[in-house]
Amino acid sequence: MNYKENTLCYEEYCKLRESVGWINFSRTQTEKSLQNSLYTVAAEEDNQVVGMGRLIGDGMYYMIVDIVVQPAYQQMGIGSKILNMIIEYVDSATPDGGRSSIQLIAEKGKETFYESRGFKIIPHEFCGSGMRKVIRK
């Protein structure tokens, strides 16, 4: 398995989302989002992208989005490797004496995957519930 940084393209992105039943966004919106990502990881096997993850943020607050592994390749450590690479990126970008916060929205049923890697379900002792608003046109 090869892991490539910052090479994720529109076609690979859409194919991976479709492989897990996620709806794709418009090409224009997706290409802009990929360009504006701080960091992307693509897992490649036999010249085929089988997993991905993206990081967005501002240098203090980060959000992990689009962690996807094709179903046939799940339970092989690919998602863990992608997540670890993203966390390492944030760690290396955090200055000495600084602090960074990483958020994500786990797919239902995948919460324990993230909990086992140090993420906490919110609300907890320091945070209220996470929220989101979707705008459709």
Feature-to-residue mapping (PLM):
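Active-site rim helix/loop that mediates acceptor-substrate recognition in acyltransferases
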Residues: 17-44
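Conserved beta-strand in the GNAT
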Residues: 42, 48-56, 61-63, 68
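Conserved acetyl-CoA-binding loop-helix of GNAT-fold acetyltransferases
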Residues: 69, 75-89
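Short alpha-helical
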Residues: 8-11, 59, 108-112
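Conserved active-site alpha-helix within GNAT-family acetyltransferase domains
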Residues: 91-127, 133
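Short amphipathic alpha-helix that is part of the acyltransferase structural core
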Residues: 1-27
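Accessory recognition modules or surfaces
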Residues: 38-40, 80, 87, 131-137
